[in-house]
């Protein structure tokens, strides 16, 4: 195993942050100029959105089921089982829906982007694109960025709805609660700030998934082994950053809306 000094490691971190920032800046800047590769963007939307839909639906539904069961156990001690709908709605819309959807899409698509672009890098397809006058960032990264941000937004909404539906299913069938009471308490517990918070988070998560996945793919070296390493690094880094962004956005929303 090769050891490096703390100074060299710090320089590597700074260089990586710099390269990642430049990649993000170029990818975002390309959105506002031609060519935009619309067909590639729609292809990525289909792959990311439609391809991720089954796991998002299942994850959201069963998360809502478990959440309702656990909430009922705790609320029963206070005689407040009827408030299960409130807890499920708030938890899914503000936290679990955005975070779990981001993690599911990250595991599926950040790894896919890293492996796909990494394979292109080690097979010198990226260099061939540059030689032909095509900007790899504009062609490969920007369509994935736009598609991921756009589709993750709607996937999160679907996950929230499935989670609430799962909570309602368990509440009605196992906990013998009234469906009207479940949905009423859930609806009345929400304020505009909760909805805004739940819809802002997937925008940041989508940005992280696409840019991190593409960044590690484009920096791949070392053949097929390097592709595997880049794929693993992309999933780990994007997952950690999604949770970090969730914390920061939650703290910001609490400061703005007080909850």
Segment roles from a protein language model:
Residues 1-39, 216-221:
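Short, membrane-interfacial amphipathic segments enriched in basic
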Residues 33-57, 239:
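Membrane-interface helix starts
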Residues 46-100, 104:
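Active-site cofactor/substrate anionic-group-binding motifs, chiefly glycine-
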Residues 53-65, 69, 149, 153, ...:
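Hydrophobic alpha-helical segments of membrane proteins
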Residues 70-93, 161-203, 211-231, 252-259:
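Membrane-interfacial helix-loop-helix connectors in multipass membrane proteins
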Residues 84-127, 155, 212:
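Hydrophobic alpha-helical transmembrane segments of multi-pass membrane transport proteins
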Residues 117-142, 224-227:
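Short cytoplasmic-facing helical segments at TM-TM junctions of multi-pass membrane proteins
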Residues 135-156, 230, 234:
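Start (N-cap) of specific transmembrane helices in multi-pass transporter permeases
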